[in-house]
Amino acid sequence: MSSEKDKKNSCSKFSLSVVAAILASMSGLSNCSDLYAVGSSADHPAYLIPQAGLLLDHIKDIFIGPKDSQDKGQYKLIIGEAGSFQDSNAETLPQKVEHSTLFSVTTPIIVQGIDQQDQVSSQGLVCNFSGDHSEEIFERESFLGIAFLGNGSKDGITLTDIKSSLSGAALYSSDDLIFERIKGDIELSSCSSLERGGACSAQSILIHDCQGLTVKHCAAGVNVEGVSASDHLGFGGGAFSTTSSLSGEKSLYMPAGDIVVATCDGPVCFEGNSAQLANGGAIAASGKVLFVANEKKISFTDNQALSGGAISASSSISFQNCAELVFKSNLAKGVKDKCSLGGGALASLESVVLKDNLGITYEKNQSYSEGGAIFGKDCEIFENRGPVVFRDNTAALGGGAILAQQTVAICGNKSGISFEGSKSSFGGAIACGNFSSENNSSALGSIDISNNLGDISFLRTLCTTSDLGQTDYQGGGALFAENISLSENAGAITFKDNIVKTFASNGKMLGGGAILASGNVLISKNSGEISFVGNARAPQAIPTRSSDELSFGAQLTQTTSGCSGGGALFGKEVAIVQNATVVFEQNRLQCGEQETHGGGGAVYGMESASIIGNSFVRFGNNYAVGNQISGGALLSKKVRLAENTRVDFSRNIATFCGGAVQVSDGSCELINNGYVLFRDNRGQTFGGAISCLKGDVIISGNKDRVEFRDNIVTRPYFEENEEKVETADINSDKQEAEERSLLENIEQSFITATNQTFFLEEEKLPSEAFISAEELSKRRECAGGAIFAKRVYITDNKEPILFSHNFSDVYGGAIFTGSLQETDKQDVVTPEVVISGNDGDVIFSGNAAKHDKHLPDTGGGAICTQNLTISQNNGNVLFLNNFACSGGAVRIEDHGEVLLEAFGGDIIFNGNSSFRAQGSDAIYFAGKDSRIKALNATEGHAIVFQDALVFENIEERKSSGLLVINSQENEGYTGSVRFLGSESKVPQWIHVQQGGLELLHGAILCSYGVKQDPRAKIVLSAGSKLKILDSEQENNAEIGDLEDSVNSEKTPSLWIGKNAQAKVPLVDIHTISIDLASFSSKAQETPEEAPQVIVPKGSCVHSGELSLELVNTTGKGYENHALLKNDTQVSLMSFKEENDGSLEDLSKLSVSDLRIKVSTPDIVEETYGHMGDWSEATIQDGALVINWHPTGYKLDPQKAGSLVFNALWEEEAVLSTLKNARIAHNLTIQRMEFDYSTNAWGLAFSSFRELSSEKLVSVDGYRGSYIGASAGIDTQLMEDFVLGISTASFFGKMHSQNFDAEISRHGFVGSVYTGFLAGAWFFKGQYSLGETHNDMTTRYGVLGESNATWKSRGVLADALVEYRSLVGPARPKFYALHFNPYVEVSYASAKFPSFVEQGGEARAFEETSLTNITVPFGMKFELSFTKGQFSETNSLGIGCAWEMYRKVEGRSVELLEAGFDWEGSPIDLPKQELRVALENNTEWSSYFSTALGVTAFCGGFSSMDNKLGYEANAGMRLIF
């Protein structure tokens, strides 16, 4: 038996002989049906006949060459000379086939098993050696090279296991190689060459209009080493290779060096091909590679080379208008330092173009250099019709999926685009730039993703720095370039779970878990949601290296100067503009200990970040962790959030500044947005929500609410966790668990800090070890629970601004302005907070700054600043329930000023407290030179201090100047400055120029002096004190102005000076208003203390004229039941002087010596309440008193209770409406016609009535309305006799005609009814019983409101007789007209039980009933139409009702607080009523009927009366 080696040699020799015969007889044989060559078979003869023919005209349609060459002659057959090349020497080979050869393929060509690699010059099964072409040949010939032209459905070419030593083991042409219309498959497999083109090599290759192409396991052995850079990617080709140098770079048919696969209608497959030492595992071209208009799947699988694992080209690579493209598991194994460019699938020195394809997939391609799937100068993916997928591609350096040196454009695609699971050192999915290894320099390009219709996603990409060599840029988990644009895309754009692991280095930019751009990032005009979720940048441990490398690593660590940032996005300038929805969620930035610059858990814009015009923006659950790492969500030099419909920053965390936003240099602007929310953000040092270290925070022009809630800045300690972050492995499950644990620990540390008790007494605080000065300095650097800035402007917002439950460890629970670092305090900018021009309320509620006994000089529960200005606001400004060590609401630092103006709303301080004040504390003035500049309020508005004003170091202060209340510079300042219930010590002279200064609820106001101008008013309540402090301070210029005003005023007043020579008054008051509402005469209460004026010991009275007027600040007037119900003595005023803390009667002023005029409130005709007399003022025990003696009570009509009694009328009205509906629709002639039948029916009803009269205003009318539904069943027990039952439910409302009172009503009604027809007489009767639940609210304005609930019941019994008179023929056929007079008797009764109201001005009502008997009468016109089973009756009724009997029982009402009772009554309705009714009853068949009815009514015959209303109903019935 022969050996395998012998068989192989035999096969080879036989195959060569067949090939020799073919080539030798090409011009001599006359017939050819099959070309077949195989090793041991002699049954397949070889025939070949040259056939003249033309290439199809449409070949020219895809002509790639110069346009002017398309018109050069016709394609004709050129037959080469006969010869046998295998017997010739290599030197003579080019002369054997000198011209082109055209093969007509009509049956399959199969050749396999030819191995010529042991022959040094073996080249090609079919060869063309044309040599250099003269111009004469080019002018004469239209085609040069080898062409296979199919001519039938069975044609095909199979070339298998062919090997040669030179290029093109199967086919070689120094000119073109063309496959045209081969409708059987073209299969080239296991072909190999020791040079280029394992299967085919030519000057250019065209495969056109063929059935399919399969190229497998071909290999090229050429070595690319030493090839110039310009020819580098065209050198190789495991299967196909083209080079433009074979024929002097000339080609008649297509450009030299190009490979084109066009309009093939079968699959194209390149699998397992390789060029181990060169480029282009499947294809290498010195020109272009073009796949165009192919109809079936094109796949490149498991190919490998140094660069371009599947395809490499010196020019462009294009796939256009093809079906599905698949590139899978291709490998570019060359490394960067060996001059390999990369491109796991494709590598081009020009553009890679993917256009108008039905689907594209790049999966598990790998590059040991750059571009895991694609490498090129430019990459264009546009107008594809199917999905584009890059999955699990890997690059050792940049561009896990794509690396382009200049631009990447992904535009106009119609379906989805996804990049998943890619890995690289930078640019996990796409990197754009020329990353030269020389001097670590990089020239970055741009990425444009725009106008795509489908969703775009970048998922689970990973960047892991593989070496310390690339230090300029590290990051870009998904995208990396100089400029990146995502614009005008219609689908959703998602960046999720992309991660960057980088070394801490002295590089310029480190980070960008999803996007890294050295220039601009523009995300604009996208219609779908844009989401960045779960992206991260984390430090990577420096790998184990040699001692020299370790030394370099240590040096690198020490010289870190780059910026680390952007858990999701890092760019120089970031603009997110006019998108639909933008979400940054759960992105994170983790930095090692040596990285001390940067931040931005989600976004880092080095120069600016602009988020403008988006519909919805959310930054949630992002965090930035590391040493001095700021901006839990966003970091930039300047930030602008403008014109967004909704903005939400929630649960972001930073371990240095700016829990949500950090602005490092410029300003942070929140301008012209809709709803803005900053909630649950956490910062460690400055700014729980926003930190703006060197600029301003501007909140202006927003059109919806702006809320800062539950933000915290505190100092947690978690050094152990930071160490874990630095050394963890990003790929391990353990790392993910540690990251989650880290975030949980950070959050818990914030929670623990904020949960500490605020109000512990100093001695009850736990003991602590000695705190060093350095530690105290660190503790002090914590401020701005919501905002930290140089200045804060809250202006011109349209809706409320809310700061709620924000917390700071030290300063400013909500807002801090200024600096805590000495280097920044030299700034000439004065820290200030300005709240101005807002239309909505501005509210600070529940904010807090923690008390630390080691830092007593801290605070500002809501605001800590130097200057505070609140002015020109149309809404209220409220400080409610804030807390701090000092300044429960506001802390003003030394040299600061406060200017408050209540313009279109009030300014209120209520419930604020501090540890230092041990209670109430509105504003704390620190240092010796802080002060209040002015307090102004416009008419109807007030500045209200329910908490104290506290000044530090009162005794040591220099003169704090003049405090002006309601400056006369604006005549509109006539409102009030009101102190309630607390003691405020203001070390300033107070000048009340106009408007009012009010001390209520026992308030104490201490100052250096008080002056009242003629237009000003001072109001004191019981127990309040106006106290003058003893001051040695010198008068400043402002006090001199006060002295000038004193000298110019001539109004008589109580003028008290420090001594007889004083020119500036301690007290200069002409009128004091005493608040009557503050006094009470209840026996169980202690008598109220008289208001006091207290001056220092030794004060001198210069004049003693004073007017006292009794006023009521609550507006109750004589409705003050507690004071005026009984005889009362009111202490009006007393004057004291303070001597060593004790109070004595003013020694130089006796009340009896005062010329005091007392005026009491007038009692006029419109005055309601307690009536009585005031006595003359008298002196008792050194106090001025006045007595009140009541004589009666005058009832306000709004308390009369008419609406309660009128509800009885409404109770009867519901019963009457149901009665009328049953008479109109259930007790009719139509119903009586169905003897012994049963009807089930349903009815909807409604009514409206307005009852009023000029004569009845004193009793009060009402408007009532209700709707309801009723259902019932009736039957005929005998002929012409019907009996039925029904039930109904309803709800409605009653409104008082004249006052603010209403009743909501709902109830049920049950009824029985009957009818009997006796000839022309129709008798009808019914009985109804109802129950109604009533809820009443009465509002009295300043007197409060009352509420009551009760149930009322009603009964109605009715009997009616109707005489039916026929008009017209005695026996009508279709139409009948009846005239029916009727008379009716109706009895109705309604009542309610006794009940008592709750609330202010509560009343007690006695049980009351209303009974009446009414006799309605009138006439009804009926027109009936009958045809078959159809019957319709329309009627018009006109009637009048006369009330014959009316009785009201009960009616007693008592005003409980006043102790006054009276007899109430319902409205005295007119006893006549006119009604007009329109009704329709239609029987559609013997089983179904419908009903409609409308009734209008009015009451009385006098124009003075007014009783109007309507009733409407609609229903149906089923007849059984």
Curated annotation (Swiss-Prot):
A GO cellular-component term linked to this record: cell outer membrane
Annotated signal peptide: 1-20
SMART domains: Autotransporter
UniProt subcellular location: Secreted, Cell wall; Cell outer membrane
Pfam families: Autotransporter, Chlam_PMP, ChlamPMP_M
Record domain Autotransporter: where: 1233-1520
Keywords, sorted A to Z: Cell outer membrane, Cell wall, Membrane, Secreted, Signal, Transmembrane, Transmembrane beta strand
Superkingdom as given in the UniProt entry: Bacteria
Topology term for the membrane: Peripheral membrane protein
Family: Belongs to the PMP outer membrane protein family.
Cross-referenced NCBIfam families: POMP_repeat (TIGR01376)
Name of the molecule in the record: Probable outer membrane protein PmpD
